[in-house]
Design a protein with these regions (language model features):
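A conserved beta-strand element that flanks and buttresses the S-adenosyl-L-methionine
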Residues: 113
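Class I SAM-dependent methyltransferase SAM/SAH-binding core
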Residues: 51-102
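Short alpha-helix
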Residues: 166-181
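A short glycine-rich, Lys/Arg-flanked "PGG" loop and its adjoining helix->strand segment in the class I
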Residues: 125-138
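Conserved S-adenosyl-L-methionine
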Residues: 183-194
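Conserved beta-strand signature within the Rossmann-like core of class I S-adenosyl-L-methionine
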Residues: 139-146
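Short, glycine-/aromatic-enriched active-site segment of Class I SAM-dependent methyltransferases
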Residues: 147-165
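Conserved class I S-adenosyl-L-methionine
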Residues: 1-42, 63, 150-151
Length: 208
């Protein structure tokens, strides 16, 4: 089976309106991730900047952009069609079509979020290291959600079903990647598990 670039796949999904299904399917997990991250920002009581990595149609950026403490909300995505969908729905916030593997922001962020993106990247470890070194402000937080990981056996067949390359990494390996990249206080947990579904794996850590 010939594998396609993930950007091509997601571009097609955007054109077909599947981005709305992705939004609905990920909403509960993302809500819990953002509740955790935004409570921390609220406790600090300071304005913060936000980046969504793999923003799709911009639904998370739009949501965080309404937070009274959010001074700037940005979404990046590799698929131009996704960015077009985001910009058509939102004139307030900022969207950038870019290669996530090589992107470097001109201004650092306080909170970086990503849902269902990092196992598609060519080199997740390298990108996470760059996020720690170059994307986040001191005392910034990265929070990632993924549904495809080794312990979630239902996700093992996705690469073949979707037809695009995907990493399959164990939970403790994801934690180790963040720690090796320079993040501290790294934690993992799972949200919305069910009988045959291990739930979304959340990995998060802070910069010094």
């Amino acid at each position: 089976m010939k594998m396609e670039d993930p950007i091509v796949i997601f571009g097609k999904w955007a054109e077909e309106g599947k981005d709305l299904g992705m939004e609905k399917g990920h909403a509960n997990s993302v809500k819990k991730m953002l509740e955790f991250a935004c409570k921390e920002r609220a406790d600090l009581g300071k304005k913060f900047s936000f980046l969504d990595v793999g923003c799709g149609n911009g639904w998370v950026v739009r949501d965080i952009g309404e937070n009274k403490l959010c001074g700037r909300a940005v979404g990046i995505d590799g698929a131009q069609q996704m960015i077009a969908n985001a910009e058509s729905r939102d004139k307030k916030n900022e969207y950038i079509q870019t290669d996530i593997d090589s992107y470097t922001p001109f201004k650092r962020f306080d909170l970086i979020h990503s849902m269902e993106v990092f196992y598609y990247l060519k080199n997740p470890s390298k990108t996470i290291k760059r996020i720690c070194d170059n994307w986040l402000n001191p005392n910034g937080r990265l929070i990632i959600g993924i549904d495809r990981y080794y312990e979630n056996f239902q996700s093992h067949s996705w690469e073949e079903k979707v037809g695009t390359p995907m990493h399959l990494i164990k939970e403790q390996k994801w934690k180790a990647i963040l720690e090796k990249s320079g993040f501290f206080g790294v934690k993992t947990w799972r949200v919305n598990p069910s009988k045959d579904w291990k739930g979304t794996l959340v990995i998060t850590g802070k910069t010094k």
